[in-house]
UniProtKB/Swiss-Prot annotation:
CDD domains attached to this UniProt entry: OMP_decarboxylase_like
Its job: Catalyzes the decarboxylation of orotidine 5'-monophosphate (OMP) to uridine 5'-monophosphate (UMP).
Protein name: Orotidine 5'-phosphate decarboxylase
Listed Pfam families: OMPdecase
Length: 241
């Protein structure tokens, strides 16, 4: 594995369970944060203003709204989202190749219209909360999760997306198939002994990076820690080894 000169670039802080004031306080505690993830909860409660605030503070944004609808609706959503200045925007690969291709074109068009660099669209494969048992029982899908993730990542790549979101358990075999320019964004990162909460397919930070993850999404392990700054530094130290 290559030496990582700036490990903070590899960590995306998930701002889940936080309001705008919480976010401001966290950024004061950890000014080294480079990337943040704004999900449904924060975006719905605070609106686009929170994105403007984060941009003003010089943060890079992963807008994780996981768009999943008919192709025209997904494309229009990505057109609008691309004008927020977010560097990454997520959408479900299960929306299908037509939706993904239209979304990619719309995001490029939307960003260009306001003189912004187009964002990378990231295809959601299988959420880290799914287990093999629930995958089969709830969705009646007989494929293994690995097989399904591999197929959905291929759809993302063939549609022109900039990468995909997958659990640490799938990173290694995906990285063998895709170059480093194809982002593999990995949630489900936990520190040793921490609670996995509602995620099932998890790993530690060092292993995920070694297996080929581009960036790690880390939330509660840092944001709910008694010493968030220490935990952030601890994760940076782990992935720089």
């Amino acid at each position: 594995m290559k030496n990582i000169d700036n490990p903070s670039e590899k960590i995306i802080i998930a701002l889940d369970g936080m309001d705008k004031d919480d976010v401001v306080n966290l950024l004061k505690k950890i000014p080294e944060i480079v990337w943040v993830k704004v999900g449904l909860e924060l975006f719905v409660s605070e609106g686009p203003d929170v994105l403007s605030m984060l941009r003003e503070k010089g943060k890079k944004i992963f807008l994780d709204l996981k768009f999943h609808d008919i192709p025209t609706t997904v494309a229009r959503a990505c057109f609008a989202a691309s004008q927020t200045g977010a560097e990454f925007i997520s959408l479900h690969t299960c929306a299908g190749m037509k939706a993904l291709k239209m979304a990619n074109e719309a995001a490029n068009e939307g960003a260009s219209k306001v003189n912004l660099i187009p964002p990378k669209l990231l295809g959601i494969t299988i959420l880290t909360s799914w287990t093999r048992e629930s995958f089969c029982n709830d969705l009646l899908i007989n494929q293994s999760i690995d097989q399904r993730v591999k197929h959905l990542a291929e759809i993302a790549s063939n549609s022109g997306l900039g990468g995909c979101v997958c659990s640490p358990k799938e990173v290694q075999f995906l990285r063998e198939s895709y170059p480093e320019t194809f982002e593999l964004i990995t949630p489900g990162i936990r520190s040793l002994g921490s609670n996995v909460n509602d995620q099932s397919r998890v790993s530690d930070a060092s292993e995920a990076i070694k297996m080929g993850a581009s960036k790690l999404v880390i939330g509660r392990a840092i944001t709910q820690s008694n010493d968030s700054a220490y935990m952030f530094k601890s994760f940076c130290d782990k992935i720089s080894i």
